């Protein structure tokens, strides 16, 4: 109990604890016997004003995560429990070589202060809890008494006002975590909840490129211009997907699928696109479906690849091991992102490393830990390997560029202006706007941004539909990248040998033939080119939406383009 060591109420306990630690330091050779006896004889001196000292001693989110990572590695190395490992770290005289970039950490902390809600709008709602802490904003009745509810079992429930939170983390392409902030506003406690490092959330559509699309390209099942139908994979009359709202309202939830076949209205088409539409039954090139984050297109790619193949890749190769092997091996989880627990922002950012050159490296917060004599005590246990071929990685890089640079992209025009450097990204929205994401990459860094409530809650209940958008996460990422990259020299993404640009027919998706009146340019693996189109086309062809050009201007109005 920390109250036992309150220096104002129990100073004798604190002196005893201090002297016990000093004795251990002497016994372990950290200090001499003379130093121990001199220090143990000193009285306890309390400062009159400790507020500034307490504030300055609050550790950053990065330091908190670093502490936990090193403690975990000591536990594994020495075979000791957590308390022993913590004591070893406190008293062992170790030097930790951290991966943090101080300038980037400071810039991220300043942005995540979110002064005047500059980046993340404040949404508040009442949350029912069984106890209230000193940090909670308790809901009171008009007469000044706490708002409560008593359950049937006698449990008293209280209410607190909670606001939207956010997290951000940046890595380089060697897995080094460079900056991390796990909450909005000023940090007031050390080792507080770190939403960037230790909290899992549903991924929404951010899982589409690292799973279905990447493997579809890797396996040669689809390419840049593969034409896919913008319609549900399953129709209502197929009786595959239950309409749970209908079943719930009509008392059918307990029925088996066989019994439910007698109720045609108990089924629905699936999936829907963001906003509730089922598509227009048109054929669209793959790049367009990814840029617009159309569920109807992604689910067809995922169906070709297979949910189990996607799960095995993201779980084992990309180390998203907080996914659930018993409940997440399905298209809804692996393509739509509605997982049981989800993943942390740090793990998701690490997964997007593969769109640089195909390499994956385990994210880590330190390189080495040295003992007091300068000997290596720990080295980070990260692993690095080729998760995708460089060719697939580069095609995916170009595809994800369209999210930011194409007029139809879900984050159209919101790329950072950093000395002409390119970027890629993917938006993501979990069901009912409970989790909003953006993961973005530049030639230097990859960053994940999450926004939502700590306890998942539909953000449109407290913010307008126009406010609860992924563009909030994109805008924060854009501002942060422009700050940390402003003095960096121009750097391109590494182009892969074996990837070629080719003109394709916008009607067939095949390489453009002499009779194709409408063409666009795509990126293809040289060993997996489409056939050449030899169709006979009608003369009245409308120009199709175009992918991002090498130099793209920002659309005049992008306010209505968020679709995911």
Where are these regions (language model features)?
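A penicillin-recognizing enzyme superfamily signal
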Residues: 98-170, 177-182, 186-202, 207, ...
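Glycine-rich, acidic and aromatic/proline-enriched surface loops and short helix-turn segments
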Residues: 1, 68-76, 170-186, 217-221, ...
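Primarily short, surface-exposed interaction patches in extracytoplasmic proteins
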Residues: 311, 316-345
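Extracytoplasmic/secreted proteins, especially bacterial periplasmic and envelope-associated proteins
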Residues: 13-26, 38, 57, 61, ...
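Surface-exposed intrinsically disordered loops and tails
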Residues: 126-158, 237-280, 324, 458-468
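Second-shell loop/turn segments in exported
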Residues: 2-12, 21-22, 26, 48-56, ...
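Conserved catalytic neighborhood of penicillin-recognizing serine enzymes
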Residues: 52-55, 221-310, 331, 372-402
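Non-catalytic, structured segments within soluble enzyme domains
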Residues: 1-106, 110, 178, 320-321, ...
């Amino acid at each position: 109990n920390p109250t036992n060591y309150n220096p104002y109420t129990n100073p004798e306990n604190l002196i005893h604890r201090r002297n016990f630690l000093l004795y251990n330091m002497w016994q372990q050779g950290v200090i001499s016997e003379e130093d121990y006896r001199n220090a143990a004889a000193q009285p306890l001196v309390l400062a009159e004003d400790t507020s500034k000292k307490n504030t300055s001693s609050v550790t950053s989110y990065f330091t908190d995560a670093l502490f936990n990572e090193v403690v975990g590695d000591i536990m594994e190395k020495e075979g000791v429990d957590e308390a022993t490992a913590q004591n070893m770290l406190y008293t062992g005289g170790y030097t930790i070589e951290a991966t943090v970039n101080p300038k980037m950490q400071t810039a991220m902390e300043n942005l995540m202060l979110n002064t005047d809600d500059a980046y993340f709008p404040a949404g508040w709602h009442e949350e029912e809890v069984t106890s209230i802490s000193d940090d909670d904003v308790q809901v009171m009745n008009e007469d000044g008494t706490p708002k409560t509810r008593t359950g049937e079992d006698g449990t008293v429930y209280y209410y607190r006002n909670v606001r939207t939170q956010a997290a951000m983390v940046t890595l380089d392409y060697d897995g080094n975590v460079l900056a991390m902030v796990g909450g909005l506003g000023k940090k007031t406690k050390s080792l507080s909840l770190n939403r960037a490092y230790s909290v899992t959330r549903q991924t929404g559509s951010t899982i589409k490129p690292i799973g279905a699309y990447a493997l579809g390209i890797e396996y040669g099942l689809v390419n840049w211009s593969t034409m896919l139908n913008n319609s549900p994979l399953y129709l209502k009359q197929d009786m595959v997907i239950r309409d749970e709202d209908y079943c719930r309202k009509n008392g059918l939830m307990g029925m088996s699928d066989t019994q439910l076949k007698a109720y045609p209205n108990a089924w629905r088409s699936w999936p829907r696109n963001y906003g509730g539409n089922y598509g227009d039954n048109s054929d669209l090139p793959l790049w367009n479906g990814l840029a617009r984050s159309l569920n109807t297109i992604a689910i067809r790619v995922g169906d070709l690849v297979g949910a189990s193949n996607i799960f095995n890749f993201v779980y084992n190769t990309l180390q998203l091991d907080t996914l659930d092997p018993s409940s997440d091996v399905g298209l809804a989880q692996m393509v739509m992102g509605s997982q049981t627990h989800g993943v942390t922002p740090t793990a998701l950012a690490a997964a997007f490393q593969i769109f640089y050159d195909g390499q994956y490296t385990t994210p880590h917060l330190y390189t080495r830990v040295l003992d007091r004599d300068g000997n290596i005590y720990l080295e980070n246990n990260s692993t690095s390997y080729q998760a995708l071929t460089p060719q697939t990685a580069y095609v995916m890089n170009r595809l994800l560029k369209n999210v930011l640079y194409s007029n139809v992209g879900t984050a159209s025009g919101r790329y950072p202006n950093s000395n002409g450097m390119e970027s890629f990204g993917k938006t993501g929205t979990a069901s009912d706007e409970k989790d909003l994401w953006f993961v973005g990459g530049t030639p230097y860094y990859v960053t994940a941004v999450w926004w939502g409530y700590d306890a998942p809650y539909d953000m449109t209940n407290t913010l307008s539909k126009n406010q609860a958008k992924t563009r909030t996460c994109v805008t924060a990422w854009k501002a942060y990248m422009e700050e940390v990259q402003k003095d960096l020299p121009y750097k391109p993404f590494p182009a892969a040998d074996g990837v070629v640009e080719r003109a394709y027919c916008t009607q067939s998706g095949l390489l453009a033939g002499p009779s194709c009146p409408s063409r666009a340019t795509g990126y293809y693996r040289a060993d997996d080119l489409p056939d050449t189109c030899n169709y006979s086309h009608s003369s009245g062809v409308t120009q199709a939406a175009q992918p991002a050009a090498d130099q793209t201007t920002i659309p005049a109005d992008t306010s209505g383009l968020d679709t995911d």
